Regions:
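Conserved ABC ATPase signature
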Residues: 149-153, 157, 439-443, 447
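Conserved beta-strand-loop-alpha-helix hinge in the C-terminal portion
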Residues: 230-260, 506, 516-520
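Helix-to-loop junction immediately C-terminal to a conserved catalytic motif
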Residues: 65, 348
Length: 520
């Protein structure tokens, strides 16, 4: 053990966690997010926390981190103890890493970002920078200087930076809430390896939430599965608790029925023809490629680009000519930071191209508009091109879940009764009917994602652009999402999706365009 490892290991001190018939109801909600939760986690244990979407996993993690708030923020039942004291009094004992790398990057420089938490603990300056050096070393970012810009980090590097910031506070409990949900495969590997180094060197107690669990099975020694509170009986509680082999071997069928992911479970196949393209190194501007795209346009193209360059401050891709077709799903893949989300926003007409244009089939062009989607008004896009944002909250415009889904149909001239009928059907498909009157912003992450998809599907666009449509989904809702996307495809729409989800690409038989950093 190095001096760095010995210092951190001797200082942190793993702590235990206990839940005693614990439950929490958010102040704005009628039902409890979770209820009747009982378990004891011993110091140094490594626990994978599972459950269906909406089972309260993130609420429990926030409770353990002491950030749920007081009585004015909600109602608590039972006890939740961290290190033997009420979790709300134990905030300095926990380190929490969330799923969004960008949301956790606070300051401009790597060193300052890691030091931020320590500064809030009022530690001496020398001690702070000592911890910063130690933590960056443990997560494998010690090669970066303290002055290195956080803007230049990839998604995986940002998550490792967030992990370093949590580790620098010397918590006895490390909480990871879907830390790889928004990462490419390389980023997933980086975070997995960094966490392995952390728990091997510091021996901290670990609780990790993740829907796709294969990444973590080699690091955990225990699995706890939360039940989803029933709308009538509000039972919830813990469905299963034991080693991975015990839980998945004895309770696999029960867990799958409840919506949890279970290793080895088959997924539905909704494939059509499968093709592979590559967007990078000028591949799509060759004469033969351009001729092929022109032939495709004359057949069934609904959206296409002409010599497109996209980006914000600088070009992320240039001279792109690509067509999207009726009844086809296209996956935009590639590592974090190459511009997949930026390209998606450009294709949806929401971000101005740096050069070139995005066009549609002639029959889709609104009256008195040119065939350049960025020049259209928002009302022109409705029913033609729909966008599901990476952050669901960015598209919510009403104060109730039901009204959110009804916005599209109402804006397209449907009566209120017709719009609500469409909304109710879509909420049922998305397992959101019990939240019809709830504020969209109070839903869980997975529920918000399903609502954002439902609101776009209700408008029945000819082109549907989706940014990470399956993040935060359990086994049941993931399969339902795949069925819905396949339905949209089979009804004649073109679907364009940014994704790192290889299972989704395979299930839909999607055409793949790899967005390459070679376009810079």
């Amino acid at each position: 053990m190095t001096d760095t490892e010995r210092t951190v290991a001797s200082t942190a001190g793993a702590i235990g966690v206990s839940a005693r018939d614990w439950g929490w109801r958010h102040a704005s909600r009628k039902d409890f997010a979770l209820r009747h939760v009982d378990f004891d986690i011993r110091p140094g244990e490594r626990v994978l926390l599972l459950g269906a979407s909406g089972a309260g996993k993130s609420t429990l993690m926030s409770g353990l981190a002491g950030v749920l708030g007081g009585d004015d923020e909600g109602e608590q039942e039972g006890e939740l103890l961290v290190g033997g004291v009420d979790a709300r009094s134990a905030r300095g004992m926990c380190g929490l890493v969330l799923q969004d790398p960008d949301a956790q990057t606070i300051l401009e420089r790597v060193g300052d970002d890691v030091a931020f938490g320590c500064e809030n603990l009022n530690l001496p300056k020398d001690e702070i920078w000592k911890r910063v050096r130690e933590s960056l070393d443990i997560v494998g970012l010690d090669y970066m200087g303290f002055e290195h810009s956080t803007r230049k980090l990839s998604g995986g590097q940002r998550q490792r930076l967030a992990l370093a910031g949590a580790l620098a506070m010397h918590p006895g409990l490390l909480l990871l809430d879907e830390p790889t949900a928004n990462l490419d495969p390389d980023g997933v590997r980086q975070v997995h390896d960094a966490v392995r180094h952390v728990i091997e060197r510091t021996h901290e107690t670990l609780v990790v939430v993740e829907h796709h669990i294969d990444v973590w099975l080699d690091l955990v020694d225990r699995v706890i599965v939360l039940g989803k509170p029933d709308a009538v009986h509000h039972v919830g509680g813990v469905l299963a608790d034991g080693t991975p082999d015990e839980v998945f071997g004895r309770y696999g069928d029960l867990l799958a029925e409840s919506g949890a992911w279970v290793p080895g479970r088959a997924i539905a196949d909704h494939t059509k023809a499968h093709a592979m393209d590559r967007m990078g190194d000028g591949a799509d501007v060759r004469p033969e490629t351009t001729a092929r795209i022109r032939r495709e346009r004359s057949r069934d193209t609904v959206l296409y680009t002409e010599d497109l360059s996209f980006g914000r401050a600088f070009a992320l891709g240039e001279h792109i000519n690509v067509a999207f077709h009726v009844g086809e799903v296209t996956a935009l893949t590639g590592r974090n930071g190459v511009g997949k989300s930026t390209l998606a926003l450009t294709l949806a007409g929401l971000l101005k191209p740096l050069a070139g244009r995005v066009c549609v089939a002639d029959a889709m062009v609104p009256e008195r508009r040119e065939n350049n989607v960025f020049t259209w008004k928002s009302g022109d896009l409705l029913g033609r091109i729909g966008m599901v944002f990476q952050e669901p909250e960015h598209q919510f415009v009403t104060s109730s879940v039901r009204d959110e889904v009804a916005v599209g149909p109402r804006s397209m001239g449907r009566t209120q009764e017709e719009a609500y009928a469409i909304a109710d059907g879509m909420l049922g498909r998305m397992h959101l009917e019990r939240f019809a009157k709830a504020n969209p912003f109070t839903l869980s992450g997975g529920e918000k994602r399903r609502l954002s998809v439902a609101s776009m599907l209700a408008a029945a666009p000819k082109v549907l652009v989706m940014d990470e449509p399956t993040f935060g989904q359990d086994y049941a809702t993931w399969n339902e999402m795949v069925r819905l996307i396949a339905m949209v495809r089979d009804e004649g729409s073109a679907v364009i999706m940014v994704t790192h989800d290889d299972a989704l690409v395979k299930a839909l038989g999607a055409r793949v365009i790899n967005v390459s950093e070679g376009e810079r």
